[in-house]
From Swiss-Prot:
This is UPF0225 protein Pput_1155. Belongs to the UPF0225 family. Pfam families: SEC-C, YchJ_M-like. PANTHER family: ADENYLATE CYCLASE-ASSOCIATED CAP C-TERMINAL DOMAIN-CONTAINING PROTEIN (PTHR33747:SF1), UPF0225 PROTEIN SCO1677 (PTHR33747).
């Protein structure tokens, strides 16, 4: 049992916060998933980062680069600005945040508006660096059963 404070910035203990999600409990919303992913980078949990990325994108992830970035960075904090459920589509959400870290090149911060989709009771991060191969009339890669153009097309940079 961990007695450390969760890296996500909640002030809660890891086991009472993101540790639940790292152990397999589905995150209840996109913001909780995003916070748990930040914590996973801090803790070097690359398998969790891959598992919580949209399944259609997982094969395109660079696991070694993710592990290197995680290990070679000193994580300085996370600030969540907003979490938005998108109009009429509660299974789609954006979370805007700023993550700060230090590496051999100095201090950095990254502000992002990340897209998330919920499918079969689990939230997934839609990685903007990994393309989705889908035509507008093809089934959506998120496995929602909807056409891509009516589902995730507007949330990814295809």
């Amino acid at each position: 049992m961990s007695v450390s404070v969760c890296p996500c910035g909640s002030g809660n203990l890891l086991d009472a916060c993101c540790g639940h999600y790292h152990a397999g409990t589905p995150a209840p919303d996109a913001q909780a998933l995003m916070r748990s992913r930040y914590s996973a980078y801090v803790l070097g949990l690359v398998d969790y980062l891959v598992a919580t990325t949209l399944p259609a994108q997982q094969a395109g992830l660079d696991r070694a680069a993710m592990a290197d970035w995680s290990a070679q960075s000193t994580w300085l904090g996370l600030e969540v600005e907003s979490a938005e459920v998108l109009g009429g589509q509660p299974e789609h959400s954006f979370v805007t945040f700023t993550a700060r870290w230090h590496d051999q090149d100095g201090d950095h911060q990254h502000r992002e508006r990340s897209a998330f989709v919920q499918h079969a009771g689990r939230w997934y991060f839609i990685d903007p660096t990994v393309g989705l191969k889908a035509g507008r009339n093809d089934p959506c890669p998120c496995a929602s059963g909807h056409k891509f153009k009516k589902c995730c097309a507007s949330y990814v940079g295809n």
